[in-house]
């Protein structure tokens, strides 16, 4: 302990978790002293080169500065370092090299959590760290701590290896845990922490919280209280003066030190080092001042415990019957163990056989304990504590039934439309006559098993034992024999003869198993012997009478046990003085006898507890050290008082002061056992954690008890609702030691209880199931092989890995060959169904046919087989045979009265009819299935019921009535919500979203259900779906057209943007940036529009995909092109960015589209001359692509531009070219209307621009013909008026003018136009050249 332990050897535990008992051991004058000095001295020992934290060459510097320079002591810093960087690495276990593929996956998950860090903060909270930031690009997490307790817990968890697995459980998906064993062992997630930074953080938090304990170079533990200016050397520290956190602290030497001693201590204390967090906590626990005088000083010496023989170093005369008298050189056999730092031990004189307490300082041990495990456990029975009553054989049976049980063997399987649609095309055809080699091998194995099946008994008996721990969940491994008598209240308790059975029983000279209940803290012995006593007061009086009878008869052992019992009863009622008298009498009755060592331990422990509570310093000095020696040195002693924990805490303080890791480990084990026995498991946590770390740091070989200890720790974490710590603890247990069968199954159970939802079968269990298989023995293990393989098959199938599931189920079939006919058939049916799910329906048909041919299935199994055969036949395209098989299955279900199977059979019939195109018949069968399902409990058939309702709703929306289909969708959603199945809820909501967006559009309902779907996507942690939904909801709000809706759309767009960034979906990200820019354009926030568009363009260019760039540039131009302001900005996006990309990539269609947009935009912006270039380009591209419609559009736009530029003849030419490309004959009214408009424009061009009334009249008449054909009266009125004017004023044809005028008047009357004028002057104003010359 000369150097501060590194991060891997710090074993902190939560300050508030352990029992609050007295601190320290006997007089702590030499154990804990006070050093008054500058705190910075603690770090002076480290030079600059030691203070710098090592940085790997391939790592970037931390994203956040965790603190000042490493070589600066915290007390000299302006800010205490409380931040820590966690570096996450994906490595290969054997070579320790990085795994680039897994590292990328890890970085992707970190990126997701960087956007939404709530789950990461939750996991780090379990590790007692506070999340500051995530830097996914550097694979780093920055955490901080605010208290010493937090850094203590975190460093403990990290040292135990929990941080690696906690973060792996969070960051890795379920597929990672389903890797094959070779792959699983190959890769791992590791969390690296800078040890120097962790040390500085720990020390700075210690300084912030007040005085703390340090180890000085003279190997003494002292308290660091403050700067050197506070005093001139070690000072006495009494009571709470300067104790850590204001608690009572150990007292130092009461006599003032001499100057020479003072200066020497100051000199040796030049470079003290803080104790590790666990020792800080153990010494901080408030102690009683009377403990100062107990047991003498603790001097650092031999830290090893000792067993076996010892030789006396000097003569010793015992001061009482319980103390051994011996002479120097005598041999003494130690009973149990001699614990360093304790002044007493129990021994037997080799020559005389006398047993008593021996002064540890007066003997020399011949057998020091070299192995830590031998110091922790003094016999084999103590090791059983970790697995005692935790996981019984019945628990294991129930677990395997839950894991391996499947409805496929007893309940008809529903033919899912989704599964059928995913069947491979070749498997829908008639199967080929010859199967591949692998299916042939499977079929051969099936036939072999069926042959063996015929010779097996129908209902074999399960083995009486699976070889698991024999302890049940509530029965101890040591089942004491109950006494064979029972005393009633009416008996004469003063007559020794009447009490002979009780007194003779209690007067046994040694320990018997039935005495365990007498010494136990709960006193179960009383309830078994004195059943008729309901009043404890009356019982105490009767026992007092029995005590008198024992005393009168001279039965000393009975007297001692009765006095002990009376003392316990008085102590329970807080009659401490009376209890002390009884315990003292019990001690006196023993007369130094150690025949019943457990009784001696119980008496001393209870008496020491009473003396401490009564503050009896003198008696404590005599009894407490001996009680501690008995508690630590006696193997498998019985916990007899709750105050035993205080004595063990005192022994732990002395072990820390004496720097004996073996004594510390023994004390931690006993404290953990004590608290677990008292149903205080959370108080045992710090001691279990410290025990595991002590064993790890000792370099001792792995042992079986370690696995059980980790699992006990995991069970306590589970009680504290720390699921990630549970999973990590279980994983570490499996990696550190080769677990037993019971331990592996116990691990599976813990994972099932603590795995995050919504995984009902978490993939993490696969590792422990395979471990259980590896631990099976050839004898009893054979019965478990089948259920374990079946459990693995169900697990892999649940997660969609049907290939490995088939392999495991095949092995389960082979392993269950002796399990009985029904079990074999069930396994074969399950195997066939897995082949169906895997898209191998022909193989499934062959397996099921083999079962049928063997004639071994029961009637209900025949129904299941018939239904499954029908499903497989349907998927291979044999509809008729499938219908026949469904009918057989339905008939079996009706004969057996199985309503659920009838409902599934009818639903399958409906799906088959729908597949065959008989939708009305399908609807009939589905309705019948719904009627049956509605009568069944949802717990049995909820998922199938939901699926059938969705199927029926889909059918109704297709063929009507659609409103009824909506009702079935809503019913399905209610059923899924009631049974709490998220996947079913998601499917139902998706159907409702489609219904309200496509079948019966409703914007409000569509938004509501999309938002519900979004919440469900968050529950199942599907980020891809979540991003898509956010994008869709944004579009929905955008379509509402209100400012509030636009702001909501912007919010959803930004959320989707964050997800797309995390998922590295660059295309989606670019579109999201652009969508946000579009919404800002609608909200008229112009300064943000350009910014978001620019970022979108940068993202598109980052991908290096010119097609994406082209799409983005065009879409950016569309924002302005479709808007009402700043439309000129669209020109640069179209002309300068998108069009060159379209030319470069050879995308002629995009080039044509852009040219058309530019022509239209430039025409609107009054720049027809510039538009001509793009109009000609559009025309050329249209001709090249053979697109007649776009060619006609191009000619039309060219004509319009030429018209605007005043080029009448060119405009006439292009209009005529456009008309020549129209369909002939005309098909639609729109085409006729186009003729009307174009001929009108041509007439105007000829009349006004080319000054040719005659040709203009011709175009007008063509327009009139089209208008008459169309029946457009307004157009006819307009054209008739024009013709009347031309013929009246310019062509001077009065007859035609009158005709056209009358026609115009007729349409004017019909259209309620009051007057039709033929004024020549306005026309002359429009076209001066048309004005007639005056007569001369």
From Swiss-Prot:
- Residues bearing Phosphotyrosine? 1248
Superkingdom of the organism of origin: Eukaryota
Matching entries from InterPro entries are given as: SH3-like_dom_sf (IPR036028), SH3_domain (IPR001452), SH3TC1/SH3TC2 (IPR042772), TPR-like_helical_dom_sf (IPR011990), TPR_rpt (IPR019734)
Result of altering residue 719 to H: In a colorectal cancer sample; somatic mutation
Q: Where are the TPR repeats?
A: 560-593, 601-634, 665-698, 786-819, 863-896, 946-979, 1027-1063, 1192-1225, 1277-1311
Here the segments flagged for biased composition (Low complexity) are 62-74, 247-266
State what protein this is by name.
Answer: SH3 domain and tetratricopeptide repeat-containing protein 1
Annotated gene: SH3TC1
């Amino acid at each position: 302990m000369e150097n501060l332990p590194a991060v891997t050897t710090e074993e902190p535990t939560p300050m508030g978790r352990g029992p609050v008992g007295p601190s320290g051991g006997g007089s702590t004058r030499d154990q804990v002293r006070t050093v008054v000095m500058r705190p910075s001295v603690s770090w002076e020992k480290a030079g600059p080169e030691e203070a710098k934290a090592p940085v790997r060459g391939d790592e970037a510097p931390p994203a956040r500065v965790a603190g000042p320079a490493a070589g600066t002591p915290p007390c000299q810093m302006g800010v205490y370092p409380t931040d820590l960087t966690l570096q996450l690495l994906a490595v290969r276990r054997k070579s320790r090299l990085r795994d680039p593929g897994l590292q990328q996956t890890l970085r992707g998950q970190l990126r997701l959590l960087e956007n939404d860090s709530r789950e990461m903060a939750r996991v780090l909270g379990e590790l007692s760290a506070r999340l500051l930031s995530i830097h996914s690009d550097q694979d780093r997490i920055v955490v901080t701590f605010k208290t010493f307790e937090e850094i203590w817990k975190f460093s403990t968890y990290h040292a135990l290896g929990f941080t690696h697995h906690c973060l792996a459980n969070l960051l890795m998906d379920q597929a990672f845990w389903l890797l094959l064993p070779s792959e699983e062992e190959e890769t791992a997630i590791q969390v690296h922490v800078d040890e120097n930074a962790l040390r500085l953080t720990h020390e700075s938090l210690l300084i912030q919280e007040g005085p703390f304990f340090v180890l000085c170079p003279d190997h003494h533990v002292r308290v660091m209280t403050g700067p050197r200016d506070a005093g001139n050397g070690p000072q006495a520290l009494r009571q709470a003066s300067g104790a850590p956190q204001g608690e009572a602290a150990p007292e130092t030497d009461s006599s003032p030190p001499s100057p020479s001693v003072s200066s020497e201590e100051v000199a040796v204390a030049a470079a003290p080092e803080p104790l590790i967090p666990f020792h800080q906590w153990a010494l901080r626990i408030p102690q009683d001042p009377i403990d100062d005088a107990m047991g003498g000083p603790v001097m650092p010496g031999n830290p090893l415990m000792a067993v076996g023989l010892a030789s006396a170093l000097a003569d010793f005369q015992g001061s009482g019957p319980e103390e051994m008298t011996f002479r120097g050189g005598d041999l003494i056999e130690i009973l149990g163990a001699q614990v360093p730092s304790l002044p007493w031990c129990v021994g037997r004189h080799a020559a005389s056989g006398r047993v008593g307490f021996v002064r540890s300082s007066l003997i020399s041990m011949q057998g020091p304990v070299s192995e830590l495990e031998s110091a922790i456990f003094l016999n084999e029975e103590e090791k059983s504590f970790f697995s005692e009553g935790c996981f019984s054989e019945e628990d294991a049976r129930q677990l395997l039934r839950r894991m391996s049980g499947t409805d496929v063997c007893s309940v008809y399987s529903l033919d899912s439309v989704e599964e059928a649609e995913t069947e491979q095309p070749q498997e829908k055809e008639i199967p080929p006559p010859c199967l591949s080699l692998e299916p042939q091998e499977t079929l051969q194995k099936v036939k072999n098993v069926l042959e063996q099946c015929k010779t097996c008994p129908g209902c074999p008996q399960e083995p009486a034992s699976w070889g698991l721990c024999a302890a049940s969940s509530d029965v101890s491994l040591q089942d004491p024999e109950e006494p064979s008598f029972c005393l009633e209240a009416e008996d004469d308790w003063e007559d020794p003869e009447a009490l002979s059975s009780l007194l003779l029983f209690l007067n046994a000279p040694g320990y018997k198993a039935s005495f365990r209940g007498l010494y136990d803290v709960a006193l179960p012995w009383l309830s078994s012997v004195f059943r008729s006593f309901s009043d404890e007061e009356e019982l105490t009086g009767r026992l007092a009478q029995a005590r008198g009878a024992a005393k009168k008869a001279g039965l000393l052992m009975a007297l001692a046990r009765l006095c002990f019992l009376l003392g316990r009863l008085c102590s329970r009622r807080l009659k401490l003085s009376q209890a002390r008298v009884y315990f003292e009498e019990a001690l006196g009755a023993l007369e130094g006898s150690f025949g019943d060592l457990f009784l001696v331990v119980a008496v001393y422990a209870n008496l020491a507890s009473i003396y401490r509570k009564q503050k009896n310093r003198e008696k404590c000095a005599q009894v407490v050290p001996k009680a501690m020696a008995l508690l630590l040195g006696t193997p498998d002693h019985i916990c007899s008082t709750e105050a035993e924990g205080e004595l063990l805490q005192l022994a732990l303080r002395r072990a820390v002061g004496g720097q004996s890791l073996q004594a510390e480990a023994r004390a931690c084990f006993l404290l953990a056992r004590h608290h677990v026995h008292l149903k205080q498991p959370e108080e045992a946590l710090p001691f279990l954690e410290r025990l595991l770390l002590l064993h790890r740091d000792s370099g001792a070989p792995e042992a079986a008890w370690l696995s059980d200890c980790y699992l006990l720790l995991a069970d306590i974490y589970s009680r504290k609702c720390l699921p990630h710590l549970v999973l990590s603890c279980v994983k570490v247990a499996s990696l550190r030691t080769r677990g037993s069968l019971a331990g592996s199954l116990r691990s599976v159970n813990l994972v099932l209880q603590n795995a995050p939802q919504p995984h009902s079968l978490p993939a993490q269990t696969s590792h422990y199931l395979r471990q259980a298989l590896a631990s099976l023995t050839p004898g009893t293990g054979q019965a478990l092989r089948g259920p374990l393989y079946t459990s693995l098959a169900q697990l892999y199938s649940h997660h969609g890995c049907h290939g490995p599931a088939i392999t495991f189920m095949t092995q389960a079939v082979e392993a269950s060959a002796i399990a009985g006919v029904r079990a074999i058939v069930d396994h074969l049916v399950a195997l066939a169904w897995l082949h169906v799910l895997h898209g191998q329906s022909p193989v499934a048909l062959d397996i099921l046919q083999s079962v049928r041919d063997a004639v071994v299935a029961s009637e209900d199994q025949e129904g299941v087989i018939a239904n499954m055969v029908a499903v497989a036949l349907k998927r291979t395209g044999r509809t008729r045979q499938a219908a026949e098989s469904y009918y057989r299955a339905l008939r079996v279900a009706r004969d057996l009265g199985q309503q659920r199977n009838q409902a599934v059979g009818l639903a399958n019939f409906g799906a088959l009819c729908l597949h065959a195109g008989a939708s009305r018949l399908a609807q009939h069968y589905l309705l019948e299935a719904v009627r049956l399902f509605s009568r069944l409990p949802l717990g049995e058939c909820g998922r199938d019921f939901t699926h059938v309702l969705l199927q029926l709703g889909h059918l109704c929306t297709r063929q009507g009535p659609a409103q009824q289909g909506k009702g079935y969708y809503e019913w399905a959603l209610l059923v899924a919500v009631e049974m709490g199945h998220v996947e079913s809820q998601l499917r139902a909501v998706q159907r409702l979203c489609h219904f309200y967006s496509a079948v019966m559009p409703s914007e409000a309902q569509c938004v509501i259900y999309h938002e519900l779907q979004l919440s469900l996507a968050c529950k199942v942690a599907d980020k891809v779906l979540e991003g898509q939904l956010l994008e869709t909801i944004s579009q929905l709000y955008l379509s509402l057209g209100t400012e509030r809706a636009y702001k909501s759309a912007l919010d959803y767009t930004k959320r989707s943007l964050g997800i797309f960034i995390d998922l590295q979906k660059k295309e989606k990200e670019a579109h999201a940036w652009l969508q946000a820019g579009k919404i800002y354009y609608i909200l008229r926030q112009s300064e943000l529009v350009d910014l978001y568009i620019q970022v979108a363009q940068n993202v598109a260019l980052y991908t290096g995909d010119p097609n994406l760039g082209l799409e983005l540039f065009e879409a950016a131009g569309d924002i302005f092109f479709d808007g009402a302001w700043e439309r000129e900005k669209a020109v640069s996006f179209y002309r300068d960015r998108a069009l060159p990309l379209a030319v470069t990539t050879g995308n002629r269609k995009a080039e044509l589209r852009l040219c058309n947009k530019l022509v239209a935009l430039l025409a609107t912006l009054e720049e027809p001359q510039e538009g001509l270039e793009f109009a000609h380009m559009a025309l050329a591209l249209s001709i090249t692509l053979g697109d007649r419609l776009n060619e006609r559009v191009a000619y039309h736009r060219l004509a319009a531009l030429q018209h605007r530029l005043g080029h009448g003849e060119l405009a006439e030419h292009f209009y005529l070219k456009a008309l020549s490309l129209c369909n002939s004959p005309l098909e639609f009214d729109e085409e006729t209307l186009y003729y009307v408009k174009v001929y009108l424009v041509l007439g105007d061009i000829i009349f006004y621009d080319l000054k040719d009334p005659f040709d203009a009249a011709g175009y007008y008449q063509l327009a009139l013909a089209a208008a008459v054909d169309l029946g457009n009266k307004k157009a006819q009125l307009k054209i008739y008026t024009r013709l009347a004017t031309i013929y009246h004023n310019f062509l001077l044809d009065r007859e035609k003018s009158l005709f056209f005028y009358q026609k115009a008047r007729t349409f004017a009357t019909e259209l309620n136009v009051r007057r039709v004028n033929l004024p020549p002057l306005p026309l002359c104003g429009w076209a001066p050249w048309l004005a007639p010359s005056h007569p001369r």
